[in-house]
């Protein structure tokens, strides 16, 4: 292929890529299934209990109940509802974009168990006697009053029932919906608004399969009630008792505002990454921008393909993935720069870097996969969305940042147009050696030669131990400020166009017949408020408070309620997630490198986790489920940085082959850190830029999540440089002292020329 044809191929491919994305991006964005926190709606987790004593809740009963709930949801007209059966006796319902949340929740939890009883409250007919789908809301011809009509399966049975009632002294046929133990017709008949729907006198047997319920419906509200009863009867009754043990509702405006802010923050973060890559890496940086844009597009396409639900943490994961994709590019570009500095041509440097960087990228991303997989397995809906996006992002990193980026760069490199333009790859001519000098990439001088990381690590490890001890004391004294996800209770978030005052919020809570345990006013110009209750509010209390807030402040609030049972489970799952992620990482690193590297990596990770926990404890920052997602992300991301350094340690061990002195170990540690320092700084800078943008411009609801990421990223860079690798060096020195003849053979070359690291 001629020089010009490669450039033409590059330009044509880029034009096709961007033309394809430009033509379809609107439909891709339109088809993104937004979660509750981005478009409003609600999520309820029901505990399914037997309605009658002695009944059992088995798999069949759960599936039947889920089907009935789905029928009711279809009546509400909600697009793409999610109804999931969860073992052993739970059903999760997610309705995004539902307009009347109160009505929807009432419709879902109602048993819709219609019974026809006599005046002594004895059951004569039940919902099982009604023909499926026969219920209608109609109007009486004479009075135009709303009614509900339905047909019975057996008209002879209905005739027999009406005949029996007609012969009684108190000859009324009472229609009940969801009759409860203790309910009584005679008591309710004395009230202005009785619980039963209607009570009609029966003077003679009715020889018909049609039943009409009337008298209990008046005006427009009566029409609405009659229509709802008809729809519930057609959807089917629930032969079980549903108890809400977790609920989360978000107002549409609240969700839209969160989406707008986070998208804006993400745009700023990604734009700054693009500028950095172009300024620091120049021509390869331009290729990286093309690959990163494709990465965002393809990740969203894949997310739509698997029908993923995009939540706020999921959106953050998408942007965080951009930082991780940048890392894959930076690893390769730094390798290219090293190869250019020892005197190789651009084409040779590209070829060599292409081979040497792949395994490093693979290893570093696989550890993040472990953390994301654990998050997906143990997390609830919003955390699952985060984990799903993270897993897809890592897959797309290999598609775009590895394969697409390399292919595009190979077209430019092989064209030879940039043959001697080393500055376009970020390397000055006076920094290049002659290839005949025989300089190895591992012998190149860096900007950090004056830094003795082994010497610096000793006092810094001491400082870290001191921080851990102080952190333990802080944790013991202050404890963690657990959010309702773990402590149970109810949290209400809302915003207003006007400044909110403590007194106004207190009054609204008081008017709702409640007493708040904590009220916080925050946000720009005090326009955001958070109200917390230690008790989990009932649905009726939720509804009343929501209506009062909307009336006073003009915003439908986000209400999150967690029962003590769920709070305990979430806390348990959070601990298990952290333990399993750590075990998975230590096993993988031990297999790919050595157990000392795995152990020192996990100790560094635990240090990062503890730093985040200690800071959150000291400053009384609330810990919720997204905090756990942030911690596990740091676990996966911090190990990413550590593995890149350990990969360079492995290369340096390969060069040394045999270790006989502790000075050699110190030298390997120092050189490995120095050689990967630029990559570490550049990578963390690109990710921190995104995190800081979301921290300052993103939605308030993910502020704590983003803050935990920010603290973890800073701590992660510190621990990978001053804890993980130096700790490995300390353990390696002990191994050397205990070894026979005071000698360690760390590398042997097989006859097949395959590498073999002995550690």
Name every feature range the model reports, one short phrase each.
Residues 1-759:
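A structural signal for conserved, well-ordered secondary-structure elements
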């Amino acid at each position: 292929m001629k020089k010009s044809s490669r450039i033409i191929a590059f330009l044509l491919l880029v034009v096709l890529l961007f033309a394809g994305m430009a033509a379809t991006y609107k439909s891709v964005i339109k088809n993104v299934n937004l979660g509750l926190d981005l478009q409003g709606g609600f999520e309820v987790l029901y505990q399914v209990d037997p309605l009658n004593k002695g009944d059992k809740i088995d798999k069949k009963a759960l599936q039947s109940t889920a089907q009935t709930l789905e029928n009711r949801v279809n009546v509400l007209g909600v697009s793409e509802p999610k109804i999931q059966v969860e073992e052993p006796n739970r059903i999760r319902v997610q309705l995004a974009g539902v307009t009347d949340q109160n009505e929807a929740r009432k419709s879902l939890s109602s048993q819709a168990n219609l019974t026809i009883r006599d005046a002594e409250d004895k059951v004569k007919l039940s919902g099982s006697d009604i023909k499926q789908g026969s219920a209608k809301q109609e109007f009486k011809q004479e009075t135009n009053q709303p009614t509900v009509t339905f047909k019975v399966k057996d008209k002879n049975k209905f005739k027999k029932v009406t005949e029996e009632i007609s012969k009684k002294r108190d000859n009324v046929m009472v229609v009940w919906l969801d009759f409860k133990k203790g309910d009584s017709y005679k008591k309710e008949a004395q009230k202005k608004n009785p619980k039963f729907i209607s009570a009609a006198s029966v003077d003679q047997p009715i020889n018909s399969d049609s039943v009409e319920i009337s008298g209990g419906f008046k005006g427009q509200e009566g029409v609405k009630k009659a229509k709802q009863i008809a729809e519930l009867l057609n959807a089917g009754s629930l032969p079980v008792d549903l108890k809400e043990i977790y609920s989360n509702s978000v107002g549409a405006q609240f969700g839209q505002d969160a989406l707008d802010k986070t998208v804006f923050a993400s745009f700023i973060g990604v734009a700054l990454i693009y500028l950095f890559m172009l300024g620091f890496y120049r021509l390869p940086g331009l290729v990286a921008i093309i690959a990163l844009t494709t990465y965002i597009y393809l990740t969203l396409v894949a997310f739509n393909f698997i029908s993923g639900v995009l939540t706020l943490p999921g959106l953050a994961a998408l942007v965080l993935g951009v930082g991780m994709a940048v890392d894959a590019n930076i690893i390769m570009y730094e390798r290219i720069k090293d190869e250019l500095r020892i005197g190789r041509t651009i084409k040779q440097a590209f070829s060599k870097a292409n081979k040497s960087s792949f395994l490093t990228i693979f290893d570093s991303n696989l550890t993040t996969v472990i953390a994301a997989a654990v998050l997906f397995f143990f997390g609830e809906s919003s955390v699952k969305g985060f984990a799903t996006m993270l897993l897809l992002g890592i897959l797309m990193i290999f598609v775009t940042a590895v394969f697409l980026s390399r292919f595009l760069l190979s077209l430019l490199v092989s064209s030879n147009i940039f043959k001697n333009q080393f500055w376009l790859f970020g390397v000055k001519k006076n920094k290049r050696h002659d290839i005949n000098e025989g300089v190895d990439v591992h012998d190149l001088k860096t900007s950090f030669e004056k830094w003795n990381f082994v010497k610096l690590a000793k006092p810094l490890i001491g400082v870290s131990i001191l921080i851990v001890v102080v952190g333990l004391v802080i944790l013991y004294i202050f404890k963690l400020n657990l959010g309702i996800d773990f402590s149970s209770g109810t949290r209400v978030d809302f915003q207003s166009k006007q400044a909110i005052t403590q007194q106004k919020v207190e009054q609204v809570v008081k008017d709702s017949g409640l007493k708040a345990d904590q009220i916080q006013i925050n946000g720009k110009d005090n326009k955001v408020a958070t109200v917390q209750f230690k008790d989990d509010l009932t649905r009726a209390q939720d509804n009343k408070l929501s209506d009062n807030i909307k009336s006073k402040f003009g915003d439908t609030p986000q209400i999150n309620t967690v029962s003590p049972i769920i709070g305990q489970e979430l806390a348990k799952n959070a601990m298990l997630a952290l333990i399993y992620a750590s075990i998975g990482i230590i096993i993988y690193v031990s297999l790919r490198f050595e157990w000392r590297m795995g152990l020192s990596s996990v100790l560094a990770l635990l240090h990062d986790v503890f730093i985040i926990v200690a800071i959150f404890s000291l400053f009384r920052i609330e810990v919720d489920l997204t905090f756990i997602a942030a911690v596990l992300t740091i676990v996966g991301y911090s190990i990413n940085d550590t593995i890149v350094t350990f990969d360079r340690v492995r290369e340096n061990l390969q060069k040394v082959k045999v270790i006989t002195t502790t000075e050699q170990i110190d030298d390997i540690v120092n050189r490995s850190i120095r050689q990967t320092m630029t990559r570490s700084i550049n990578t963390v800078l690109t990710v921190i830029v995104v995190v800081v943008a979301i921290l300052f411009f993103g939605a308030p609801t993910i502020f704590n999540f983003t803050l935990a990421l920010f603290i973890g990223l800073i701590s992660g860079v510190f621990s990978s440089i001053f804890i993980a690798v130096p700790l490995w060096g300390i353990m390696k020195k002990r191994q050397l002292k205990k070894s026979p003849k005071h000698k360690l053979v760390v590398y042997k070359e097989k006859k097949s020329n395959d590498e073999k690291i002995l550690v």
